[in-house]
Amino acid sequence: MQVFPVWSSPRRAAFRVAALCTVAAVAGCGPRHEAAPEGDGPRIVSFLPSGTETLFALGLGDCVVGRSRFCDFPPEAAALPVVGDLFAANEDALAALRPTHAVLGRADAPQAALLRALGCEIVEGRAETAADVLAFADTLGELFPGRTNGLANARTRWREAMEKISHPERAEVFAPARLASGVSRLESHAESAENAERVLVVVSHAPGRFGAAFAAGEGTYLDELLRAAGLSNALAGVKGYPSLDPDRIAALAPDLLIDVHPDGDPPDEDAWSYLQGVRAVTIRDTAALRPGPRLPEALERFRGLVRGDRGR
């Protein structure tokens, strides 16, 4: 599991992990699920923010009865009872809700043993790339075949939204996009590195100037968004989320630095002032940061940075 250091507060570090959903999956395995207990209908709790968004996007929101404290979208999800966070679960809250299914980043997550003891089926939703999100949606379709009408309608809306990615002027607030088309578009829109602006995406950093930072390398969802938006990752050839000291950051000499800052605390405006000639922007919401159904909105946000839009 990808965990970023607690530099300023446990809340900030945990939120970055939740917002980015950098949950390592079991090597060589896609989404999977285990035998479910019988019941009158699914009662789902989700500990994975991107998983929660996908559940609602597929029309399964009425089955979701609880969430982690980081599952804050859509608004209907934010109104649900909190049953834990990324690493722990509230046994009393779970017992009261009687869930039949639990969405976790991986089947051996810290909460899994308690959930199994309560008779809950574990649904693993890997969330590191756009393809992972599509695979998770397919898993949900297999688990809940009785709700295929909702799934079919959602996929129709996905297809319409994904087609609008090529026409930003017609982009609309996310109505779930067809992730299969989105994955294909992420692959086909990669631009030549010779002409693309070189970008460093920082996902967590120490407070103040000259602090160390973690940034998104190749093979990450943020790297996919960069390439799809016609940008080049300054960490080409580096996998995952490496730790970078100030000297390494300066040596990379990116044209643009994107500081993802999804929590409520104000960003440190002085953090990157030591980088000469580098345009730095801050993205403060989670829409562009979670591998999930808001993929079209995320891609438009990154394309806006190509046009010189300010982060927000």
Predicted regions and their residues:
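Extracytoplasmic substrate-binding proteins
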Residues: H33-R43, P110-F210, S232-A236, L244, ...
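Alpha-helical, coiled-coil/dimerization segments enriched in small aliphatic residues
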Residues: R69-F73, R155, A213-G240
